[in-house]
Structure formats: C-alpha cells, structure tokens
Amino acid sequence: MSDTYERPRRRPPKKPNYKPLIAVMAAVLAILSVVAIAISVPGCTPRQNDPTLQSTTTPTTGPTTSAPTTVPTTVPTTIPTEPPVVKIGTATVAATGDILMHMPCVRPGKQADGSYDFAPYFAHVQDYVLSADYAVANLETTLAGTDGGYPYSGYPNFNCPDGIVTSLKNAGFDMLLTANNHTYDTQTLGFFRTQQVIAENGMDHIGTKPDAESDSYKIVEINGIRIGMINYTYETHSDPNKVDLNGGADLKENEKTLINVFLKDDVEGFKTDLAEKLADMRADGAEAIVLYIHWGEEYQTKHNSQQKKMAQAACDLGVDVIVGGHPHVIQPMELLESETDPTHKTVCLYSTGNALSNQRIAEMRLKTGHTEDGILFSFSFAKYSDGTVRVENVELLPTWVNLYTSKQTGKKVYDILPLDDQIEDWKTQFELTDSTLTQAEKSYDRTMKIVGEGLQTVQNYLASLPPVA
C-alpha cells in the first residue's frame, strides 16, 4: 500500500461582514450632516438670551448664581419753566394845576414887538417838568386872538395871547387840557382856534376835538407803555339836547359832541359815557388809564359827595389815576378800592389847585392863601414782561406863586416856585425876602396838611406791592 500523504485541504478564511458597521457609520454621518446643515442655516443658531429657549431649560438641582441684571439708565427729563417776570419799562407823567390867565398875569408878558412871552413864570419849575417823560397842564383860558372881535381878557370870559402855549411848551409841557367851564368863553371862534394853536405848537390836547371823526381821548405811548388819557368837565344845562358851560354859553348843535361833559347830579350818566369811551381806549391799545376831570366846588379844600361818587365810579371802571381841577385850591389825595374788582385800586388827587393865577390873598375874599398854592403831581407806571402795567410811584411837589417886581424890567413876575423839601435854602435858591420866605413856608404847610395823609397812604400801599426786578 502505498503511503500517500494528502494534506488536508484548508478552507479559505471567512471574509469579515462590514455591513452593520457601514450602516452605523452611515447613520452617524447622516446625523452629523443634519447638524452641520442646521448650524450653517441663518436664524437656526440657538440664542443664549432667547427667552423662549430659556423658558424650556430644565433647572439644575444645585445652587445657581444669578447673572447680573442690567438696570436701564433713565435720562432726566427737563421740565420747562416760565421765564421770570421782569420790569421792562417805566413812564412818568407830571400834571399841574390850573393855568388861569387873569389880565394881571397877561400884561407883564407883552414884549416890545407886541408878542407875548411868559417864560419867566416857569423858570424855576421847568427842570421838574422836564424831568417827567410827559407833562400835562390845565389851560383855563381860550385863544381866540384879537382879529375876531374878542380882546384879550381875564375873568369872567378868558382870552389869552397865543404866547402862553409857546411858553408852556418851552417849559416842558406836552399836553394841555381844554375841557373846562371856560372852554367856550369866546364862543365858536375860541373853541376851535384854541385847539388849532395848540396843535400848531406841536402839543397834544384832550377834552375837546375839532370834528366828530376825531377821538375823544388820546393814547400816548411813553417808553413802550400805552397810556390812555381823557378829560371831562361839568356842564350846567339839564337839557339833553344842549351843552351849557359856565352858566350861559350854549354850544351850537354841531359842537355839543365835541367836548366831554357830565351833569353834576347824574353820576350814572357820567359812568355810562365814561365806560363807552374806556372801551374804545382799551380797544385802541391803552394799557393804563388817566382821567383828568374839572369838577367840585370852588375854594373848598375838601372834596364833596358828588366828586367821591364819580371817583368811585371811575375806579370801578378800571381807571388808574384821577387828576382833578377847578376848585382853585388843593384838595386831598385818596386811594380808592374798586367795588367790582378788589384787586384794583385808583390813585385820586381831587384837586391840583392853581398853578398860575392872580388869585392873591389881597385880591380874594378867601384870606387863607390857598388860592396861591398848587401841586406838580407826578406818577409813574411800570410795565412787566408778562404784560402787566401798574402804578409804581407817586410824588407831590407843592408849588407857590411868588409875585414880585423884576428889578431888571420893572414888570411883575408870577414866579411858580417848586417847594422842594430837598432844597435846604429856599431863600437863597429863589432870591426871597424874609417875608416871601415865610409865605412860601406857609404855603408848603397848607398843602401838606391837605394832601400829606393821603399821599402817605398811597405810597405805603405802593411800597407793599411785591417787588419785581
């Protein structure tokens, strides 16, 4: 037997099965691809501060540290404030008493060429007049000239040379009052010519007007303050269709509406008429009102009940200052309170007396000397940035007419003296004799006895008002 060795046949090795591994790897790659795609697509990246995501986060069981909270910064809000109220202007008005041109006052003014000049009468008071922003005087005479049949004359029918207006203007006066009981002393001629002469001298006037179309008042703008001024006089006729001045001078039909008048016993009628005119003045821009009024009883140093009622009516209508005339003597000053508006007050000087006249003690039945006394009444208005206008200050300067004969000309001089208590030596300042110095001192005392208390009341009230820069 043959030995033959047959190696046993080896089975080929079993190939590894990679299919499961490939499947797993494919699955992993698929997952990674999805994640990669998610990351690469805008808007799909998780936001750390997304409140929606945060709300789905499972809280940990351990202690956590809160992230610092950012508090938003608040920007302060600026609250607008009103600008402070400040004074933006003042206006001072001066008013003097009656310019009552008796013939003894007229004659010394005549010059060699026939013209008239009364400048020496105002020489000492001129600086005080000029210190005001605006000055007013009551012209108690007419200016009819002499060509129309009227001579120059004094009481009872006054007609004065035109030179009195020129002299008043040169002394610093800006306005003349033309409504008084002597307005019609030279009838129609004097009524209109007086207004014409005043206008030709570049001065204002109130109380009368040249035609129906003209205003019955004047709005004067002084340092940016619009001050309304109006002038009334009493009349003596009860007939509503007539106007009678001085007890016998009936104005013609076409003239009766050209003067501001009132009946003494008709306070309501006066109030109604004044209210209408004040409404017009305010519509024209008046920010303050001054009433100049010819009223009262001659030679009475105390105002009467009718004056009191009329003053109260004017106060109730909002008038700021009342300047009275006609009695030819000084009457008291008073502070009135409105009965319709307790916040409104009115300063009232019932009479400024005589600025210039021949009513001397020697000529008068009244021997007290009061007819020789006058006042330069100064009052100031202040205007503020909020539009308010109010009376700010009031001053009274007593005046006295010193009658003497000039050594240079030999003529009489009616010298209006400002009795300023700041002047230590009146005798030297005004070249007075011992006798005339005594008279001046008595005049000052008479005046202050009448107005001193009321003046103090007014000044105390004004001083009590809240100060404004």
Model-derived features: where do they sit?
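Short, low-complexity, disordered segments immediately C-terminal to signal peptides
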Residues: 45-67
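Acidic, metal/ion-coordinating pockets
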Residues: 3-6, 24-27, 31, 36, ...
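N-terminal Lys/Arg-rich, disordered targeting/topogenic segments
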Residues: 1-20
